[in-house]
From Swiss-Prot:
Compartment annotation: Cytoplasm, Cytoskeleton, Spindle; Golgi apparatus
Alphabetic keyword roster: Cytoplasm, Cytoskeleton, Golgi apparatus, Kelch repeat, Repeat, Translation regulation, Ubl conjugation pathway
SMART domains: BACK, BTB, Kelch
Keyword Repeat part of the UniProt annotation: yes
Gene Ontology CC annotations of this record: Cul3-RING ubiquitin ligase complex; Golgi apparatus; spindle
Name of encoding gene: kbtbd8
SUPFAM superfamilies xref list: Kelch motif, POZ domain
InterPro entries registered for this protein in UniProt: BACK (IPR011705), BTB-kelch_protein (IPR017096), BTB/POZ_dom (IPR000210), BTB/POZ_KBTBD8 (IPR028764), Kelch-typ_b-propeller (IPR015915), Kelch_1 (IPR006652), SKP1/BTB/POZ_sf (IPR011333)
Domain annotation BTB: ranges: 55-123
Record text on subunit structure and interactions: Component of the BCR(KBTBD8) E3 ubiquitin ligase complex.
Originating species: Xenopus tropicalis (Western clawed frog)
Span of domain BACK: 158-258
GO biological processes: neural crest cell development; neural crest formation; protein monoubiquitination; regulation of translation
Record protein name field: Kelch repeat and BTB domain-containing protein 8
């Protein structure tokens, strides 16, 4: 029914009264948004680009390659093109524009990114694409290229990436490359690219406190190598480089005395007289502070209930430090320290709030420890979640082996094995083990992986992706510990039948033969929990022992953590260290790893 003029007026009056009284008038209009609208438009624009429909500009790049596309898409993604098409200059009205210095593949990738938001990067195209993104002022694409280059830094290319980032002024890429150079300094100086650094670039690297070198002499040697590559043009720079980069008090006096006159003359006279300057006046490089420590995972601080902590024991100074605990309080993780001193953890489980629940959910987490910041960096997750897997470094790659999950009918050990490529940050499955494994041991020796558990002794050949059985140990047992020491695989302790044993055996890989050694020097009554590690190039046992005493008819327990060193000639173990105080509780599942750590980056607890 149509409204009369009076009814319309009444409605307007009512709205006015509501507004005056602070009551918003009812509004039947609502706002809605389609979350797929933008994607749909992008898909349609890409379809028209592929079909050559409604295109209004042709872009010509190097070698005469032409691309028909849409002005509005180019202008939307790139301030460079927006300015070109809206400035009123000649290009704004032309049907075709020519771009010099842009490769056809790079232009194709830029257009794919503009129309799809996706880009396929490779080592062959990333720098050319970064250059194009820089010219077209597309920072989001530049950042993707930068992250790709950061993820693939290695001694062979880091100098080139550093120089490339320096040229284009990309600060994050430059800093990451520079950090990598400092961390891998001794490897980088062996590369030809190091000799092509500019003077200012060389100084920016060598004058840093974060240089990972154990001796200042390495810094001096790198300068001499750089100088000798172009002696005539670089001799004039030596005084400045020595003055800004060499910390003479940190060098051995005998080394300083043997410096050739041509280089000694380039150094300030008072700096050559090392004896007159105290080493305390110079800040030591980061690498000079490194100390090999024993890291204990799954420890609990005695003052914090069950809260996990990761103590690190420096036996040289007697100090204890604390490493950042695994993210989300992960337990029973696979642990690995690579030959390059990179610390990884994988899998595990996160404790449940329900103390009754023992069927823990397996996790697929994979983390790399960053020494300088004392934090864990996320990496590509495992293909298969697993608890208690073993991590092994072999042939330049990492392997996650076995473990267990709680699925279906309960607890299930795993046969699966996966391989991690550090350059591509990805996992791939490899051949299954012949038998499922949990609570096993895994070690690497001469590019092969050895798995031990009870009567099963397996060998894996990564290049052939092949498993084979080897001669089992003479006293088969489970839940023992294995380590490689002086061309033999040692397997110690474990459970045989229902009894814990302290048996030690050594396997000669070349002879395919097991040899029985003397038992461990631990008292069974002390209920010892034992971990086997190679520490300071020697085979060691880390032992948690429990002692029971009676005081006034009250039983009291105390625990001691001790370190025993093996003498292979005498076939004996000697206690070489005892922790000054029990700062933490080591449960049944504690694990030990050995790595070089930087005390200044850790939290000191004793």
């Amino acid at each position: 029914m149509a409204q009369t003029p009076s009814s319309t007026a009444s409605t307007e009056v009512a709205k006015y009264v509501q507004t005056q009284n602070g009551i918003p008038p009812s509004n039947p209009v609502s706002s809605a948004m389609d979350p797929y609208h933008a994607c749909s438009i992008l898909q349609q624009l890409k379809a028209m680009y592929d079909e050559g429909k409604l295109t209004d500009i042709v872009v010509q790049v190097d070698h005469g390659k032409h691309f028909s596309c849409h002005r509005n898409v180019l202008a939307a993604i790139s301030p460079y093109f927006r300015s070109m098409f809206t400035s009123g200059l000649t290009e704004s009205t032309q049907k075709e524009v020519r771009l010099v210095g842009i490769e056809a593949e790079s232009m194709q990738l830029v257009l794919n990114y503009a129309y799809t938001s996706r880009v396929q990067l490779t080592e062959a195209n990333v720098q050319a694409l970064f250059t194009a993104a820089s010219i077209f002022q597309i920072p989001s694409l530049q950042d993707q290229c930068a992250q790709y280059m950061i993820s693939r830094l290695e001694p062979q290319n880091c100098i080139g990436v550093f120089s490339f980032a320096d040229h284009y002024g990309h600060q994050e890429l430059k800093e990451k490359a520079q950090d990598y150079i400092r961390k891998k300094f001794l490897y980088v100086t062996k590369e030809q690219e190091f000799l092509h650094l500019r003077k200012d670039q060389l100084i920016s690297i060598l004058n840093s406190d974060d240089l990972d070198v154990e001796k200042e002499e390495h810094v001096y040697d790198s300068i001499i190598s750089w100088y000798e590559h172009e002696q005539e043009t670089r001799e004039m720079h030596l005084p400045e480089i020595f003055a800004k980069c060499i910390r003479m008090p940190l060098m051995e006096e005998t080394f300083v005395e043997q410096i050739p006159p041509i280089f000694a003359q380039a150094m300030p006279i008072n700096r050559v007289q090392k004896g007159k300057i105290s080493a305390n006046c110079c800040t030591r490089r980061l690498g000079m502070t490194a100390s090999e420590m024993i890291i204990c995972f799954e420890a609990a601080n005695k003052h914090s209930g069950k809260k996990q902590t990761v103590p690190c024991l420096d036996t040289l100074t007697g100090k204890v430090y604390k490493l950042c605990k695994p993210p989300g309080d992960l337990r029973e993780v696979g642990i690995l320290v690579t030959p390059d001193n990179e610390l990884y953890i994988a899998g595990g489980y996160r404790p449940s709030n329900n103390d009754v629940c023992i069927d823990h959910k397996a996790e697929s987490d994979f983390w790399l420890y960053d020494h300088s910041s004392n934090r864990w960096l996320p990496k590509a997750p495992l293909l298969r979640a697993r608890i208690g897997c073993k991590l092994v470094h072999c042939c330049g790659k990492l392997y996650a082996i076995g473990g267990r999950v709680y699925e279906g009918d309960g607890r299930n050990p795993l046969k699966s094995v996966e391989c991690y490529d550090t350059r591509d940050n990805c996992w791939t499955a490899v051949s299954l083990m012949p038998v499922a494994m949990e609570f096993h041991s895994a070690v690497e020796y001469k590019d092969k992986i050895y798995i031990l558990q009870g009567e099963v002794f397996l060998c894996y050949d990564p290049p052939r992706d092949y498993w084979c059985y080897l001669t089992p140990m003479t006293a088969p047992r489970v839940q023992g510990m294995a380590a490689v020491y002086k061309d033999s695989i040692y397997y110690v302790a474990g459970i045989r039948g229902n009894h814990r044993v302290l048996t030690v055996e050594a396997y000669d890989v070349e002879q395919n033969r097991w040899t029985r050694k003397k038992d461990l020097p631990c008292e069974q009554s002390s209920n010892p929990y034992i971990k086997l590690v190679v520490f300071k190039s020697k085979l060691h046992l880390f032992v948690r022992a429990t002692q029971v005493s009676v005081e006034e008819f009250v039983f009291r327990t105390s625990r001691k953590n001790s370190l025993y060193q093996y003498d292979e000639i005498a076939d004996s173990w000697k206690k070489v260290y005892e922790t000054p105080e029990r700062l933490w509780d080591l449960g049944r599942h504690f694990e030990c790893a050995v790595a070089k750590l930087y005390p200044q980056c850790l939290q000191k607890v004793l």
